[in-house]
Regions:
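Generic beta-strand/beta-sheet core signal
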Residues: 172, 192-195, 199-201, 228-230, ...
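Periplasmic-binding protein-like
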Residues: 187, 247-251
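Terminal low-complexity tails and localization/encapsulation signals of metabolic enzymes
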Residues: 1-63, 94-98, 127-134, 141-173, ...
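Conserved small-residue-rich beta-alpha loop and adjacent elements
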Residues: 146-221
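Glycine-rich loop-to-alpha-helix module at the N-terminal edge of alpha/beta enzyme cores
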Residues: 56-145
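Short acidic active-site motifs
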Residues: 157, 234-235
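Hydrophobic/aromatic ligand-binding patch that stacks against planar heteroaromatic rings
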Residues: 187-190, 238, 263
Length: 307
C-alpha cells in the first residue's frame, strides 16, 4: 500500500509544518531523493515527488515520481553501459564485493532507516541488512563461476552451451523486504553482465534510494544500475512495452503481473513474473541458480569433428 500523497515540486517552498527551532535545536531538513540514472542523481521529468511516511505518520523524506520519459532515459543509460557485459566475471565480482563491503560499513544506518520506514524492530531490520550484505558477497563469488557446459551429440561432434547476459533487464522489486528483495534481484542480474533499471518497493523506497551514495563509492560503472522510484505497476508496464528492454522481472500483484506479460508479448520480451509470497531471507528461495538462469540466455555452438 502506498503511503503519502503525490505533490509537484519545481522549486523549494516553505514547509507548512515549519517552526522556529528552540535554542540549541537544529531546524528540520527537507530531504527529497531524486532518481539514479546513468550514475548520477537526476530530477524526475515532471518534477513530482511523493511523501514517504513512517507508520506513526511522521514525514521521513520525499522521493521522486518517475514517469515514462524517466524510464526511457534509464534505458538509454543502461544501453550506454553495454561494456559491462564484456567485463570479465572476475572484475564484475570485485565490484560486487566492494559494494558489499561499503554497504557493511553503513549497516547500522540502513537498519535504522528500514526500521523507521516499516515499523519493524531494530533487530529484524538489522538481520535484513546483514542478509543483503551476505547476498552481495554470494553473487560476487558467482560472477566468474556460472559457466556453460559441453555436451556430446549423437553425431561426431560436441556442443558448447555458453551462458550470456540478457542485456538490459527491467526489474520491479517486491514490497516485502525492501532492501533484501532489491539486492536479491539486482545482484544476480549484474553479476552475469546485465545492466538494469530497477523500480524499488513503492511503499518503502528509501532502502533503495539510500544506496545511491553506496553505488557512487563502489566503482559501479555509470548506467549499470539505474533506479527509478514511483508507481511500480505503471512503470513496470512501460518497461514491458519498451522495445530496447530485453527482459522484465516483476514481483507484485497478480493483476499487474498479467498486464506486464501482455505488454511484453508485442516485442517477444522474456518475462519473469511472480505474485506469490517469497521468503527472501531463506537462501533456498531468495538466491541461487534460478536467479542466474533468469539473468542469462544460452548460446549453443556445434563443433563437428572427424575420425
Amino acid at each position: 500500500m502506498e503511503r503519502g500523497t503525490r505533490n509537484k515540486r519545481r522549486a523549494p517552498v516553505p514547509r507548512s509544518d515549519f517552526r522556529v527551532p528552540r535554542s540549541g535545536e537544529l531546524p528540520p531538513i527537507d530531504r527529497t531523493y531524486k532518481l539514479f540514472i546513468g550514475g548520477t542523481q537526476a530530477r524526475p521529468d515532471e518534477g513530482y515527488s511523493r511523501k514517504i511516511l513512517a507508520p506513526s505518520g511522521a514525514l521521513l523524506a520525499e522521493v521522486a515520481e518517475g514517469n515514462r520519459k524517466d524510464i526511457r532515459n534509464a534505458v538509454e543509460a543502461a544501453h550506454a553501459a553495454e561494456g559491462w557485459a564484456k567485463t570479465s566475471g572476475h572484475n564484475r565480482g570485485q565490484v560486487l564485493y566492494y559494494l558489499a563491503e561499503n554497504l557493511a560499513q553503513r549497516a547500522d544506518e540502513f537498519a535504522e532507516r528500514i526500521s523507521g520506514m516499516t515499523g519493524r524492530d531494530a533487530g529484524d531490520a538489522r538481520r535484513e541488512v546483514d542478509a543483503s550484505i551476505a547476498r552481495l558477497f554470494s553473487y560476487a563469488a558467482w560472477a566468474d563461476k556460472y559457466d556453460g557446459a559441453v555436451h556430446q551429440t549423437p553425431i561426431r561432434g560436441v556442443t558448447l552451451a555458453m551462458n550470456e547476459p540478457m542485456g538490459v533487464i527491467g526489474i520491479a522489486c517486491p514490497e516485502a523486504a525492501p532492501l533484501l528483495g532489491f539486492v536479491s534481484l539486482v545482484g544476480p542480474a549484474v553479476a552475469v553482465g546485465n545492466t538494469v533499471i530497477a523500480i524499488p518497493s513503492e511503499a518503502h523506497p528509501l532502502a533503495a534510494t539510500e544506496l545511491y551514495t553506496v553505488l557512487d563509492s563502489s566503482d559501479v560503472p555509470a548506467g549499470v544500475i539505474n533506479i527509478v522510484t514511483g508507481a511500480k505497476d505503471a512503470l513496470a508496464k512501460v518497461l514491458a512495452e519498451h522495445d530496447d528492454v530485453d527482459a522484465v522481472w516483476y514481483f507484485g500483484s497478480q493483476t499487474a503481473g498479467a498486464e506486464v506479460e501482455r505488454a511484453s508479448a508485442g516485442n517477444m520480451k522474456r518475462t519473469w513474473v511472480e505474485w506469490h509470497a517469497r521468503d527472501w531471507a531463506d537462501s533456498r528461495h531468495g538466491e541461487g541458480r534460478e536467479f542466474l538462469r533468469e539473468a542469462t540466455q544460452v548460446k549453443n555452438i556445434w563443433i563437428p569433428y572427424g575420425e
